[in-house]
């Protein structure tokens, strides 16, 4: 979903769950739900793998 894409991009940028919740004006639980779904769908096991995926898909860049 577009919301999952937003969460993925913010995770890849190094934002914390709390920061993401604040930016998207949702609860921390909602952010955790999206992160869990993304990781399950992509068969990823860590935030590092999530970041690597986001970079490879062009959702974020390394500064």
Where are these regions (language model features)?
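The N-cap/first-turn positions of alpha helices
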Residues: 3-4
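C-terminal edge and immediately downstream basic/flexible tail or linker adjoining helix-turn-helix-like DNA-binding
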Residues: 55-63
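Recognition helix of helix-turn-helix DNA-binding domains
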Residues: 16-49
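Hydrophobic residues on short alpha-helical segments
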Residues: 8-12, 39, 51
């Amino acid at each position: 979903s577009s919301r999952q894409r937003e969460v993925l991009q913010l995770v890849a940028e190094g934002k914390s769950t709390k920061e993401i919740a604040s930016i998207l004006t949702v609860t921390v639980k909602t952010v955790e739900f999206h992160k869990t779904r993304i990781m399950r769908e992509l068969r990823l096991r860590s935030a590092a793998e999530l970041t690597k995926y986001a970079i490879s898909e062009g959702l974020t860049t390394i500064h």
